[in-house]
């Protein structure tokens, strides 16, 4: 009951400061982010949940694409409208601090860290969307390729081959 009251108060505060029309239903979020449905990387819009001290304590998935569902290893229909902590009991607070900064201070941030919730190394770029929300682009960091790293390996092979041919 207390959590529901906090949520309603939060929505009222956000509505007062918001000049942008906030989507109110899952359908409105789907329509707004339709272009993101087919992205080849995970994307989500999350609504932050704050306590009385205005500290982030959780977030609610308001939109997500199928790539997000695959990365998070959860069905999309189970995620949308659910809080992160209700889906993952081993929630790590490090994500909250980054998303809170993007939401409250309008910062675009990047975090690369291990996610114990899904046992995956992640690269996440988050940015403000609607008041009280942030968007997140997520990548499995172990599946990403670094051009500079590949170029470095090519140079090492070239040097090695050059050294071997001169012997």
Predicted regions and their residues:
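PAS/PAC sensory module
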Residues: 42, 108-114, 120-125
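Short hydrophobic secondary-structure edge segments in sensory/regulatory modules of signaling proteins
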Residues: 43-47, 51, 164-167
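Alpha-helical sensory/transduction surfaces in regulatory modules that relay environmental signals to outputs
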Residues: 71, 78-80, 84-87, 102
């Amino acid at each position: 009951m207390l959590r529901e009251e906090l949520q309603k108060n939060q929505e009222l505060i956000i509505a007062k400061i918001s000049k942008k029309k906030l989507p109110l239903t899952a359908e409105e979020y789907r329509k707004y982010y339709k272009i993101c449905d087919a992205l080849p990387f995970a994307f989500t819009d999350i609504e932050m949940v704050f306590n009385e001290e205005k500290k982030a304590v959780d977030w609610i998935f308001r939109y997500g694409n199928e790539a997000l569902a695959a990365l998070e290893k959860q069905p999309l229909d189970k995620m949308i409208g659910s809080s992160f902590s209700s889906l993952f009991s081993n929630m790590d607070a490090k994500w909250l601090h980054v998303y809170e900064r993007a939401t409250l201070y309008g910062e675009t941030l990047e975090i690369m860290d291990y996610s114990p919730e899904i046992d995956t190394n992640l690269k996440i770029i988050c940015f403000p969307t609607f008041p009280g929300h942030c968007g997140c682009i997520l990548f499995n960091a172990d599946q990403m390729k670094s051009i500079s790293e590949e170029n470095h390996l090519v140079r090492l092979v070239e040097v090695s081959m050059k050294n071997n041919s001169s012997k």
